[in-house]
Amino acid sequence: MKKIPSFLQMYSALIASPTMSSIDPHFDQSNRTLIELLANWLSSLGFRTEVIPLEGSRDKFNLLATYGEGEGGLLLAGHTDTVPFDEGRWQFDPFKLTEKDGKFYGLGTADMKGFFAFVIDAVSQLDLTRLTKPLRILATADEETTMLGARTFIQHSHIRPDCAIIGEPTSLKPIRAHKGHVGEALRITGKSGHSSDPSKGINAIELMHEATGYLMQMRDELRQKYHHAAFNIPYPTMNFGAISGGDAVNRICACCELHFDIRPLPNLRLTDLNEMLQAKLAPMFEKWGGRISLQALHDPIPGYECAHSAQVVQVVEKLLGEQCETVNYCTEAPFIQQLCPTLVLGPGSIEQAHQPDEFLSAEFIDPTRELLSKLIGQFCTG
């Protein structure tokens, strides 16, 4: 068995490999180099590695590494990409792991490339020949944009682990449920003309005013109809995030576009939500036809919930001595959950994610190593 780098050497190498994902091709980057790093390290530890190209991506890949045979066992999962960074707001080099005052700075230190350094370091300290069930490690692409990596993996994967842990930054607090995310663009095409005679045009802003009234009715109905007591905000939310329209004060507005999102609870199916949205805007479609269009800004992400009775929930709560929680942000959990019961649990704080001078506190290092070793022992040694 070959010797692998130290924890900090691996951590540094991961941060030094840029893997930003973005809808904008100018900022979007391949994760090939990082995937190859992980594959080489895990191969050195005796894992079988499979690098999986993602069709329809810009040179993106998943990695599945397996030690052992058969079904069951544990899947440790995470994404390899980061969001882009605002160069003017960073004091530290985003691609150089920098330790200062008990904090490790760098893009992806917390969210979440650093998790793979923790996993490989923990695995390297174990006697893997004692495993009686397989240990799998999954590294995905494009979580920060389309979740293409996780979506593709579940479509083609035949593995059935006993459970999965996604190492997103949760401050080592277990998460067993979160809301989903639906982003929509409502576009209204009017008819321009001189503002001195509004009757000769169709004002898209006025139509949008009418449409937002229907959407606000739907927002109130969602709040009344759906409830989940485990969430701090126990109902689905709707937010009008961006609007644009018109080009001159003396012209009838010919075009107006609204971007809004809905965060459904786990008990609200995406098909039901879409039907509700179409029905609520039906009067607009019937009256104005092709002047009204509704298009998804991204593939919808469903809500996610792992039953409290699941073995992984019971084991993790006992190991950590605390109850699982819920959050309002999204992860790949709704997709991995289709394979097996899944928890979100990892080092670092979500408060540092997507922030300038992202960091992971050194206080997470030893507890994370210990927790990963216990989880592998619990689920892979029978």
UniProtKB/Swiss-Prot annotation:
InterPro entries for the chain: AcOrn-deacetyl (IPR010169), ArgE/DapE_CS (IPR001261), Bact_exopeptidase_dim_dom (IPR036264), Peptidase_M20 (IPR002933), Peptidase_M20_dimer (IPR011650), Peptidase_M20A (IPR050072)
Primary location: cytoplasm
Gene3D superfamilies linked to this entry: 3.30.70.360, Zn peptidases (3.40.630.10)
Entry EC no(s): 3.5.1.16
Keywords: Amino-acid biosynthesis, Arginine biosynthesis, Cobalt, Cytoplasm, Hydrolase, Metal-binding, Zinc
Tree of life domain: Bacteria
Annotated binding of Zn(2+) 1, by residue: H79, D111, E168
Metabolic or biological pathway, per its Swiss-Prot or TrEMBL entry: Amino-acid biosynthesis; L-arginine biosynthesis; L-ornithine from N(2)-acetyl-L-ornithine (linear): step 1/1
PANTHER family: ACETYLORNITHINE DEACETYLASE
HAMAP family cross-referenced by the UniProt entry: ArgE (MF_01108)
Record's subunit section: Homodimer.
UniProt function note: Catalyzes the hydrolysis of the amide bond of N(2)-acetylated L-amino acids. Cleaves the acetyl group from N-acetyl-L-ornithine to form L-ornithine, an intermediate in L-arginine biosynthesis pathway, and a branchpoint in the synthesis of polyamines.
Protein name as it appears in the record: Acetylornithine deacetylase
Source taxonomy: Bacteria, Pseudomonadati, Pseudomonadota, Gammaproteobacteria, Pasteurellales
Gene for this chain: argE
